[in-house]
């Protein structure tokens, strides 16, 4: 029986390259597609798109598979970057990688691939897909340190039915060894850690190109004036670096952390010590909910959740709220739950879905 045609989203990195190699070895008619989703005329010196494209093309040449490319820069700007900027303008901390997966990799790319006559797409994500009781399930990758299901919670039944994750059963060291043994030209390339498709940049400088900074007061929770901040959009809860207030007189020597924001007053709150009570919350609300199965579990529902990537699963209970919101009550206090970030729900290894944090019961959140 002939296997279906699959196109691999090639980034130029090791993971997607090994994904293509494994599919070819498994007998899939495989091709590669390189997506260009960002155009930055003001910063060509830092742009690595040309090198990434060259690496992706070199891999397809070595494997003997066809190479395609597509420019989705307009879709990325309209569906991802505009939202990214708006969230920062409102003082929240968005996660563009999640939106990028939903709107670009598993929507625009998927539609493009199907239009080219392919049946499946594949990526280098560390996650797994299976079928149980007539539906597709999104599962954590075997490599718990690299598991990327947190970034994929917006996928639904259609996307999962057309997607393969060839690295889902592997650990990162195995992937690197496979790349070396196959003599892939990019086998020693380091993993990217920047914003999805934008890359690694000096974030503060980058953001200031698109949003005017609004400096304001920096105070302690006791209202003591500490100094000025450069703009609330540059800071996130729990942040330690880049505050510019180290070595203050009359301080106890402990490092300073961002513990709160008052958006109406444009005030940034800072305090010494990581465990300040303003950073702790037991209850949060979330909206923009998505369920992988297409519907929520029966509420109230006990499960686990992550409020940030690579966090240990936290036990919680989900309860219903009207108008598309959900309340999450944790068994233990959470550190720096941040509006704008994703909360993702799990039952053992299965990713159930998630949403966007809107508010918490932490004292430092004032919007």
UniProtKB/Swiss-Prot annotation:
Spans annotated as Interaction with tRNA: 146-148, 308-309
Q: Where in the cell is it found?
A: Cytoplasm
What InterPro entries does its record include?
A: MnmA-like, MnmA-like_C, MnmA-like_central, MnmA-like_central_sf, Rossmann-like_a/b/a_fold
EC top class named in words: transferase
Q: What NCBIfam families would the database entry show?
A: PRK00143.1, trmU
Annotated protein name in UniProt: tRNA-specific 2-thiouridylase MnmA
SS bond partners: 100-196
Source species taxonomy:
Bacteria, Pseudomonadati, Pseudomonadota, Gammaproteobacteria, Chromatiales
GO cellular component labels: cytoplasm
Q: Which residues cross the membrane?
A: none
Principal localization reads cytoplasm
One term of GO molecular function = tRNA binding
What is the residue range of the signal peptide feature? Answer: none
Q: Please indicate which residues carry the site annotation Interaction with tRNA.
A: 125, 341
Does the keyword section mention Disulfide bond?
yes
In this protein, the active site sits at 100 (nucleophile), 196 (cysteine persulfide intermediate)
| Source species, domain of life | Bacteria
